[in-house]
């Protein structure tokens, strides 16, 4: 996605990358998509709220293809289903943090190994 490419090309300080991508983004995104959209705009049990929040979650990650959008919307759907089942925003935040932690760990590992792979 455009979002992922921007992160990869930014060569951001690892501390800032972790702070924003692993901690801040999941908290803000879950507050907006699950807490606000699913919890306040729609009823937490609303299928429409689940679908709208999932589709918008996919779009805000700036997908550059339908396949990438499906991946992000699918993640939004999984987080939305978890929110519907447990109605605990902190569970969604933790799942999102774990997901982003894995992605950032892989990115940092690849950046570290890049000079040795050539």
Describe each PLM feature range.
Residues 25-27, 58, 93, 97:
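Hydrophobic transmembrane-helix microenvironments that flank and shape a buried ionizable site
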Residues 59-67:
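Membrane-interface helix caps and helix-loop-helix hairpins in membrane proteins
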Residues 66-118:
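Functionally important transmembrane alpha-helices
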Residues 32, 50-60, 75-77:
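Hydrophobic, membrane-inserted alpha-helices
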Residues 28-52, 81-91:
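Membrane-interface helix/loop boundary segments of multi-pass membrane proteins
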Residues 16-25, 29, 52, 56, ...:
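Hydrophobic alpha-helical transmembrane segments of multipass integral membrane proteins
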Residues 15-19, 47-52, 69-73, 90-94:
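Hydrophobic alpha-helical transmembrane segments
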Residues 1-25, 113-118:
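Juxtamembrane helix-loop-helix connectors linking adjacent transmembrane helices
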